[in-house]
């Protein structure tokens, strides 16, 4: 298998892990916060942090990937939280992240803050 193919396969797997641990809610307020958090996480990226965590787990003898999956997702959520908060008007006031509107531009500054906080928790 070519390196690019292997990398693409791993990214697909990591993206599925990240989506697996995103919460759901029927509550209207919570749903908007979750939607904003999902918008941020699903913007893409290299996913290098969870990939390194998975490979480190394997190199240390880990066999059951179910054990490391929540930590992989949490690591990416924490990274995304830092980006969401960094983009806020009180910080860098960025309009775009990864080629699309930032979370606070789509959902408002208040939900940008709440989405970032939710990703950290």
Q: Which residues does each PLM region occupy?
A:
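Mg2+-dependent prenyl diphosphate-binding active-site environment of isoprenoid biosynthetic enzymes
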Residues: 12, 16-23, 27-121
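Conserved glycine-bearing catalytic or ligand-binding loops at nucleotide- and phosphate-handling centers
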Residues: 3
């Amino acid at each position: 298998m070519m390196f690019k193919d292997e990398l693409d396969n791993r990214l697909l797997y990591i993206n599925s892990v990240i989506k697996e641990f995103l919460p759901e809610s029927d509550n209207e307020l919570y749903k908007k916060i979750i939607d904003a958090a999902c918008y941020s996480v699903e913007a893409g990226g290299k996913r290098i942090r969870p990939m390194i965590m998975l490979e480190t787990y394997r190199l240390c003898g880990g066999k059951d990937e179910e054990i490391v999956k929540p930590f992989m997702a949490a690591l990416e959520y924490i990274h995304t939280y830092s980006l969401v908060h960094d983009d806020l008007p009180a910080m860098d006031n960025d309009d775009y992240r990864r080629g699309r509107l930032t979370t606070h531009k789509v959902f408002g500054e208040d939900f940008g803050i709440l989405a970032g906080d939710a990703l950290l928790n």
